[in-house]
Amino acid sequence: MNIIQQLEQEQIAQLNKTIPDFEPGDTVVVNVKVKEGDRTRVQAYEGVCIARAGGGLNENFTVRKISYGEGVERVFPIYSPLIDSIKVVRRGKVRRAKLYYLRDRRGKAARIAERAERGSEKGKTTPAAAE
């Protein structure tokens, strides 16, 4: 690990933020701090993560949602002080790192299949438990 990566790791540890493990295709809710006049409130932004870019402190992710029939994309820096929290609503099964093709899709064609988590399948028994 070079000195720049070491400094970034120290700064990330200093921020003390818990970032959930999410990938492109996952539906996430990003709670963003919005300043209106002299007061601050938290606004939820829910959509599909279509890309993650960068690394370390400069990493960011793009969230796409459909608002009143219009596609809206927003890029969030992961370690931004304006982000209150990130929550993963559902995991998507995709085979690409960048889902920009969703921009051209509408309705059912833009749906992403849900990813089945390993070990959470009901009704399946392990061979050791069956004996």
UniProtKB/Swiss-Prot annotation:
Gene3D superfamilies: 2.30.30.790. Keywords: Ribonucleoprotein, Ribosomal protein. One of its GO terms (molecular function) is structural constituent of ribosome. Residues 111-124 have a biased composition (Basic and acidic residues). This is Large ribosomal subunit protein bL19. GO terms for biological process: translation. InterPro entries: Ribosomal_bL19, Ribosomal_bL19_CS, Ribosomal_bL19_sf, Translation_prot_SH3-like_sf. Residues 111-131 are annotated as: Disordered. The keyword Secreted does not apply. Belongs to the bacterial ribosomal protein bL19 family. One of its GO terms (cellular component) is cytosolic large ribosomal subunit. It comes from Methylobacterium nodulans (strain LMG 21967 / CNCM I-2342 / ORS 2060). This protein is located at the 30S-50S ribosomal subunit interface and may play a role in the structure and function of the aminoacyl-tRNA binding site.
